[in-house]
Design a protein with these regions (language model features):
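Terminal low-complexity, poorly structured segments
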Residues: 1, 18, 89-92
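N-terminal first-folded block
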Residues: 3-33, 37-41
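Short, well-ordered beta-strand segments in beta-rich or mixed alpha/beta enzyme
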Residues: 3-10, 40-67
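Short alpha-helical
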Residues: 14, 46-48, 70, 74
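Intrinsically disordered, low-complexity acidic/polar segments
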Residues: 16-18, 50, 62, 99
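An amphipathic, aromatic/His-enriched active-site/gating alpha helix that lines ligand/cofactor pockets
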Residues: 25, 29-37, 56-90
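Glycine-rich beta-strand-turn "strand-cap" elements at beta-sheet edges
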Residues: 41-49, 76-100
Length: 100
């Protein structure tokens, strides 16, 4: 079963450009992971400092491999002082089966 999540955080005032640079570099690395299917980065139209990252991994093993990637820790350390939250807020999603 695919592992899908939404990661959210808000850049501190004056840090948006640095956060955008960091997440751009990180996105390029994550998209190269064998088990990553989607890593799309968005900002909220009405609040451009609010970042939303929609992530999909092939399965739980692929997600665990993502968590162990060597660039994840340094990314989170660099990101932490630039965002309002203590860390990214993660929301795990399950697909809804809808019959046509």
């Amino acid at each position: 079963m695919k592992k899908t999540l939404l990661a959210e955080f808000t850049a501190r005032e004056g840090a948006r450009d640095e956060v955008a640079r960091l997440i751009g570099d990180y996105a390029r690395a994550v998209r190269e992971e064998e088990g990553n299917l989607v890593f799309d980065v968005y900002t909220r139209a009405s609040a451009p400092r609010a970042f939303w990252i929609f992530e999909v991994y092939r399965d739980e093993d692929a997600f665990q491999a993502h968590l162990k990637a060597p660039y994840g820790g340094p990314f989170n350390v660099a990101l932490a002082p630039l965002i309002e939250e203590d860390a990214s807020v993660l929301t795990f999603l399950d697909p809804l089966s809808v019959r046509a």
